[in-house]
Amino acid sequence: MSHQEGSTGGLPDLVTESLFSSPEEQSGVAAVTAASSDIEMAATEPSTGDGGDTRDGGFLNDASTENQNTDSESSSEDVELESMGEGLFGYPLVGEETEREEEEEEMEEEGEEEEQPRMCPRCGGTNHDQCLLDEDQALEEWISSETSALPRSRWQVLTALRQRQLGSSARFVYEACGARTFVQRFRLQYLLGSHAGSVSTIHFNQRGTRLASSGDDLRVIVWDWVRQKPVLNFESGHDINVIQAKFFPNCGDSTLAMCGHDGQVRVAELINASYCENTKRVAKHRGPAHELALEPDSPYKFLTSGEDAVVFTIDLRQDRPASKVVVTRENDKKVGLYTISMNPANIYQFAVGGHDQFVRIYDQRRIDKKENNGVLKKFTPHHLVYCDFPTNITCVVYSHDGTELLASYNDEDIYLFNSSLSDGAQYVKRYKGHRNNDTIKCVNFYGPRSEFVVSGSDCGHVFFWEKSSSQIIQFMEGDRGDIVNCLEPHPYLPVLATSGLDQHVRIWTPTAKTATELTGLKDVIKKNKQERDEDNLNYTDSFDNRMLRFFVRHLLQRAHQPGWRDHGAEFPDEEELDESSSTSDTSEEEGQDRVQCIPS
């Protein structure tokens, strides 16, 4: 047969023609090594030649010498050796040998992978155990720095008492309330309990003689907290839980402002704080209304904020009490609000916080929607400007003189800002150790000169920090196994009222014989930080969704408890939610918004 390229006959008869007819063929196993260089070439590229010179293999058997002169017109591309099977000629074919080698290599690689240390999900390194040790050590150092010993307090009890006896200290009570010595002696004095659900708001009147509380049961209770007795208990008129209830100043305790999860802003008219004449609606937000900000000396005016991003100013002397001040926006997008606080030194300025990381300060005289959405200045910790997960502010509050502003961040820390600094200024102090994740928690100043910072926590404790040093100086179990949300300092005595998810109001006084031992503080701080870091590492859900699920679960639990009354609470429908206005003009609708109080 002559040499010609491209001879492509049919599949050869494997019985009569030799697959290995080649000039280089050698008899015996010795030929295997000589032809090994041609094996892979035949398996991948078909080669043609005369006399069936198919350099597609060098494997020989005993019959190979008998077929050396056989004319074969088949080419290597006509035969696929991998389809032949291993037993046909007594030797494994190329494809199968390669597969076995690959399987052996894979098994070796798997063994090596099992021997390799597992990657640390936090740092990305290979030594996970060492990473955990380093993390624990760093955590211990951080906790020690937050609870380190403080220098001796400058205010001394015996010296102050002696000076008072001699008449040289006219401000003993004022100074005592701001003394670290008294704060470190706080202990639970007693419980006030008449509610049938969690208590979401507490507020002292201007003189400090009465305490108002309300919550899930939709009732407002006015307490003579010293005698531990309720003096007034009435229906609020809200459809869903009351979030805040506050006494107006300079009104003889005759007016109480309220807001709730149904978006309503209502006012209760009291008679000598012992009888409620009626409650009426004065404004309506399109979402929950979380907080009120009373004008310090006015018995008529206050501000409200809601999750509809609207701030209302309410003036009870007007026929239509509510007027819209501003709609909070960021890049033309509304920002729902959780909190509002009025500057006590400048009643035209107020601060708000909510669904993003910015504390916004407005001046009611200078709100220009075309310029920075009307914002006077904004503050936020610089590391939260471009954080990887959404951040929310649950509470903002001004200091006693309006020069400082506290902001508590959801699942973050508490930050102190200088309100007089320019727009975008960094925080001044940072307060750590608590946990603010499940509910909308309050933060507050404590002391006549705002010497301390106090906050509740998901762990059920009350934390006190010294404002100047950021050190934790007091740590109290405020709600066993539950959450502390509200903290209300007495206007002039060293007394603190707190409430949370249980049915009681707690009264704290500095009556402990010695300073409270911070027993278990390090373990609680460590647990709070680890849980927060774990949640941030596995962050998949928004704060609003978590809050909604939490409140629904909480209300369902309360509904099955003994003593829970059916108040006929209903969620507002879409048509009602579209209303964001003050009380209706018509007398008929006015009558519907007015609820006659029925004391219990």
From Swiss-Prot:
It comes from the Eukaryota. Residues 74-83, 96-115 have a biased composition (Acidic residues). WD repeats lie at residues 194-233, 237-278, 284-324, 332-372, 388-427, 435-475, 479-518. Residues 1-122, 562-600 are annotated as: Disordered. Keywords: Repeat, WD repeat. GO terms for cellular component: Cul4-RING E3 ubiquitin ligase complex; cytoplasm. Belongs to the WD repeat DCAF8 family. This is DDB1- and CUL4-associated factor 8-like protein 1.
